[in-house]
């Protein structure tokens, strides 16, 4: 049985430089939250909790699963759209 990291390594990404498909509208809003659920639930690890409480987002390697969109739905603090055609994740095994 192979590890999840080995399977994810098979996937490829075409990064759309300067045009991320996910954006945190107000980073200060995330600082005010006691729990930063996106930092725990994102399977690709795109969200990182900094020591000062801020949440940083790097969309390179995003699996486009929509988990963060569901988690942050109530706050409305996340802009999420599909990447432009030809960009984003390229799944090798389905």
Curated annotation (Swiss-Prot):
One term of GO molecular function: iron-sulfur cluster binding
Gene3D superfamilies to which the protein is assigned, alphabetical: 3.30.70.20
Keywords: Electron transport, Iron, Iron-sulfur, Metal-binding, Nitrogen fixation, Repeat, Transport
KW Electron transport (keyword) present: yes
Domain 4Fe-4S ferredoxin-type: 20-52, 53-83
Gene Ontology biological process terms from the UniProt entry: nitrogen fixation
Function statement: Could be a 3Fe-4S cluster-containing protein.
Family of the protein in this entry: To ferredoxins from P.putida and C.tartarivorum, ferredoxin I from A.vinelandii, ferredoxin II from D.desulfuricans.
Full protein name: Ferredoxin-like protein
Name of encoding gene: fixX
């Amino acid at each position: 049985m192979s590890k999840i990291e080995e399977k994810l390594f098979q996937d490829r990404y075409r990064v759309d430089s300067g045009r991320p498909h996910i954006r945190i509208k107000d980073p200060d809003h995330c600082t005010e939250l006691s729990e930063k659920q996106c930092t725990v639930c994102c399977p690709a690890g795109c969200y990182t909790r900094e020591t000062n409480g801020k949440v940083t987002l790097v969309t390179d390697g995003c699996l486009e699963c929509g988990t963060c969109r569901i988690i942050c739905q109530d706050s409305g603090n996340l802009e999420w759209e599909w990447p432009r055609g030809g960009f984003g994740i390229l799944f090798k095994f389905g």
